[in-house]
From Swiss-Prot:
UniProt cross-references to NCBIfam families, sorted A to Z: potA, PRK09452.1
Keyword flag Nucleus: no
GO molecular function, one term: ATP binding
List of residues binding ATP: G50, P51, S52, G53, C54, G55, K56, T57
EC nos: 7.6.2.11
Identification of the protein by name: Spermidine/putrescine import ATP-binding protein PotA
Enzyme class: translocase
Function of the molecule: Part of the ABC transporter complex PotABCD involved in spermidine/putrescine import. Responsible for energy coupling to the transport system.
Signal sequence interval, chain numbering: none
GO CC terms: ATP-binding cassette (ABC) transporter complex
Primary location class: membrane
Protein's cellular compartments: Cell inner membrane
Length: 377
């Protein structure tokens, strides 16, 4: 669809569009980013995810050129831009506030960057209208920002950013101001637009659902360092430590003691006084402490009689109906509370558990994630 679809056609094959090497940054003597290394590939949707204060926005601002790294190097398409000012980098940013000029029309907002670059007048109108068509707002060209909805303003901000043909588009928590329904819609539209444009998107958020639903790849940060780098599925299903596991969705953490090894893939452990088999290939010996992690949707509840003692036993203490799912809290005999999420089937008489009911908590072998015992996470 015209020029905008080929925005990213000139690049070095096989090399990352952005490479951060040994990046460090401190504010007022406090280290915010410490020796960070990161490659960002051409045409990917990368999300930098982490809690407030983890340094994710600082990384974005250093890529954009709004902050200068104290140490390290930033390469953009194999060119060193560490000391290059923001306006000379082929990188554009969509801010949380969108930063639209209220006195300008939509057309003039999108055209602003082109005029600043002294693009010939004959090129400006077709490029602006192409960008507006790309975000499906060409008919809004003569309106002012206050006449647009939040979602429309967000799309105009994106059109203004992509019309300059950036190599990379940076988005700083740019969906957080939208209501839930609109945010879900924009997640889908952003990913679709990114595929259509072929531009590398780097998206910063603290919202795990946004990261999982939009990204090709997720970087999870804590205290200025990368905790895990992987696909959404890898981050969710195979967290490398307790911080990542707990930050990405709900997780149940069982304390386990090693009994013995069964084969090269499986070991026998004691969980809540019950002998269980889990998958764990690292070296381990009898008595070693481990942590067995299971998502609520990976657990099952089996109703048992009060006289029965099978599986990890507990009593249902709370239930929450969420339409498609029924979430139950089970208090185990040790006092630990476990969250279980089951698909709600109104025709299944056993799914709607009673408060106080005795149940056994089970799971399918190999669905668990097993980690070395972390005292601090």
């Amino acid at each position: 669809m015209g020029e905008i679809q080929t925005l990213n056609e000139q690049h070095s094959v096989g090399k990352p569009v952005i490479r951060l090497s040994g990046i460090s940054k401190s504010f007022d003597g406090k280290e915010i980013i410490g020796n960070l290394n990161l490659d960002v590939n051409h045409g990917e949707f990368l999300t930098i995810l982490g809690p407030s204060g983890c340094g994710k926005t600082t990384v974005l601002r250093m890529i954009a050129g709004f902050e200068t790294a104290d140490q390290g190097q930033i390469l953009l398409d194999d060119q060193d831009v560490t000391q290059v000012p923001a306006e000379q980098r082929h990188v554009n940013t969509v801010f949380q506030s969108y930063a639209l000029f209220p006195h300008m029309t939509v057309f003039e907002n999108v055209a602003f960057g082109l005029r600043m670059q002294k693009v010939p007048q004959s090129e400006i109108e077709p490029r602006v209208m192409e960008a507006l068509r790309m975000v499906r707002l060409a008919e809004m060209a003569q309106r002012k920002p206050h006449q647009l909805s939040g979602g429309q303003q967000q799309r105009i901000a994106i059109a203004r950013a992509v019309v300059n043909k950036p190599k990379v588009l940076l988005l700083d928590e740019s969906l957080s101001a939208l209501d839930y329904k609109l945010r879900k819609q924009m997640q889908s539209e952003l990913k679709q637009l990114q595929r259509q444009l072929g531009i590398t998107f780097i998206f910063v958020t603290h919202d795990q659902e946004e990261a999982l639903s939009m990204s090709d790849r997720i970087i999870v940060m804590r205290s200025g360092k990368i905790e895990q780098d992987g696909s959404p599925r890898e981050i969710y299903e195979d967290p490398k430590n307790l911080f990542v596991a707990r930050f990405i969705g709900e997780i149940n953490v069982f304390q386990a003691t090693t009994i013995d090894r069964i084969d090269e893939k499986r070991i026998r452990v004691d969980i809540e006084g019950i002998e269980s088999i889990v998958y764990y290939e690292d070296e381990v010996k009898a008595g070693d402490k481990l942590q067995v992690l299971l998502r609520p949707e990976d657990l099952r509840i089996e109703e048992i009689k009060e006289s029965e003692e099978k599986g990890i036993v507990g009593h249902v203490t709370d239930r929450t109906y969420k339409g498609m799912t029924l979430e139950s809290v089970v208090e185990l005999e040790s006092g630990m509370c476990v969250m279980v999420s089951e698909f709600f089937n109104e025709d299944d008489p056993d799914v709607d558990h009673s408060i106080g009911q005795k149940v056994a908590v089970t799971w399918v072998e190999s669905w668990e994630v097993v980690l070395n015992d972390e005292q601090k996470a």
